[in-house]
Amino acid sequence: MDKSFTLNRLDNGIAVLTMDVPGETMNTLRAEFGPEICEMLAEIKADAGIRGVVIISGKKDSFVAGADISMLDACATAEDARELSKQGHEVFFALESLSIPVVAAINGACLGGGLELALACHQRVCTDSNKTMLGLPEVQLGLLPGGGGTQRLPRLVGIAKSLDMMLTGKQLRAKQALKMGLVDDVVPESILLQTAIEMALAGARPAKKPKLSTVEKLLEGTPVGRNIIFEQALKQVNKKTQGNYPAPEKIIDCVRQGVTKGIVKGLEVEAQHFGDLVVSNESEALRSIFFATTEMKKESGAGDVSPKAVNKVMVLGGGLMGGGIASVTTTKAKIPVRVKDISEIGLSNALAYAYKLLAKGVKRRHMTPAVRDNLMALMTTTTEYKGIKDADMVVEAVFEDLNLKHQMVKDVERECGEHTIFASNTSSLPIKQIAEAAERPENVIGLHYFSPVEKMPLVEVIAHDKTSPQTIATTVAFARKQGKTPIVVKDGAGFYVNRILALYMNEAANLLLEGQSVDHLDKALVKFGFPVGPMTLLDEVGIDVGAKISPILEKELGERFKAPAAFDKLLADDRKGRKNGKGFYQYGAKSKKKLVDESVYGVLGLTPGADGEPIALAERCVVQMLNEAVRCLEEGIIASPRDGDIGAIFGIGFPPFLGGPFRYMDSLGAKHLVETLKRYQDQFGDRFAPCDRLVEMAESGSKFYE
């Protein structure tokens, strides 16, 4: 069997230890590497001629991308996972204990266990490549750094900075890492190895104190100050997680124990907490999302069909969505885009939108002004169909008006080539209806983005019955180039995400009309795990947008989608939400705290009564979403529970720690869910009637993920 580690002794007394996992594009750490590494370290220790060690990767753009997450699934118990952590501790302690200098030479991803390996070295040097990123992102999988990261990072960069890194999972670029003191030098890739060798030859340096500001020194230098840091971190974590994610609190505890009781105790606590987290429901759910998205990246969306190249794009409409789509096409996909709008003002807005996003990148030093200008040069504008004959894809982002979209289809087919794909960003109109105006319906597809485009990761790729596999595969590949996570869904009103969201929002509106207060409703759903509450979401999306979609869904899907009377009353008072400064909340106020616009209750003709139990309020909204998600699976709107889970998490912020609607239903049990729906059906009517698939599953005891 090929080895993952090789040792090369140089004439100057430096040994270069190269990690290159056979058959993999990136290095990941695995439990079975432990004996191999220990064997290498013993060999180094026994050779008096070795004056220093450089650890480097044999992969092109990856130092070590982290631990192999799949090995955690083999842990049957928390104790199994603790043993993995302890094994890592032993290996890294053996490395750290070498009496000769050990230097990590880092190029590319240095994440998770990879950074913990680097932290166990005596010095670190990294390249200035854009692909070099350093971080401990374990919290995003519901875990904590289990290889000593919670102990070595605070000692190197300070308590506050290390907590910020570990609690957010943020990844640092080379210059940020240097400024923080995480690495000792940043050099071009061409001299990385030579620099690391010179550092090792220079001999061990005395341990450096963390680079701390005056305030950080005052706080971290005393027990009282350190206590303030930990208590403040706990307070912020609880506010953000609502108690739904156990990992952040355990990270804080590991650091606290290590700082107050020493590294031996800290490592013991780290292993203990790591084991508990590995077998927690939250981490299992978050890891399932990781594996699902990794799997989806390998799929074309159309079987074995390969996508065609997209070298030029046109966007119809310079509004908020059009500007956002054009922006991610140039900045992420690096594809030239031409924006068409009937108004010069619309075109100016689209350019300004893109420039504003790029300017943020310059301000944060993620790019130079020259790179910004080159990316802006990829975007051109027009009020006519000019310069688009060779466009490979046209993305339509105009109003939800079927006649207007029909005109767009005809115009594009007249002005563009026969190969050009027409992708509509409609949020509710069936693609089949849009394609009725097309001479080449096989080129027509839905490409539903979510707002704001540059932030929301999901896109729905909607194929009607005549869309060709080639069009699907090309559109999926294009969306991935834009940095999106695409799910392919079948055509139908509301598609998947808006369809399950509509019933959730309608139920929240019903609760409002029953006398629940706006902020109490929002807090109940945020406590459940959503990033924002339904009333806030309505204000952000636009109350008018919700009101337009509801009749379409009701017409196509039936009475259960009938919108509550609240929408008409709000629009009659010109309340559209944040966009016009009038909605459920106050806008333009100087107060940092978001305040309810109390006049909304008068508009709706109600007086808020006693606040209901938050869990009960959340349940009533969420079971509607769950029931409809199963209907979508039943009807083939989504291809699998996996796609349904990813769509809900990335499209509307369904609580990730629950794993998505389908994993959550498995944890509840179909029998329990059907009983809950029937109870609400008795109280509120047939909009809560459980769908056939759920009833069958309740009777058979089956699950979505067997």
Swiss-Prot record:
It is found in: Cytoplasm. Its EC number is 4.2.1.17, 5.1.2.3, 1.1.1.35. Pathway: Lipid metabolism; fatty acid beta-oxidation. Residues 1-188 are annotated as: Enoyl-CoA hydratase. The keyword Lipid metabolism applies. It catalyses: a (3S)-3-hydroxyacyl-CoA = a (2E)-enoyl-CoA + H2O; a 4-saturated-(3S)-3-hydroxyacyl-CoA = a (3E)-enoyl-CoA + H2O; a (3S)-3-hydroxyacyl-CoA + NAD(+) = a 3-oxoacyl-CoA + NADH + H(+); (3S)-3-hydroxybutanoyl-CoA = (3R)-3-hydroxybutanoyl-CoA. Catalyzes the formation of a hydroxyacyl-CoA by addition of water on enoyl-CoA. Also exhibits 3-hydroxyacyl-CoA epimerase and 3-hydroxyacyl-CoA dehydrogenase activities. Heterotetramer of two alpha chains (FadJ) and two beta chains (FadI). In the N-terminal section; belongs to the enoyl-CoA hydratase/isomerase family. This is Fatty acid oxidation complex subunit alpha. It comes from Shewanella loihica (strain ATCC BAA-1088 / PV-4).
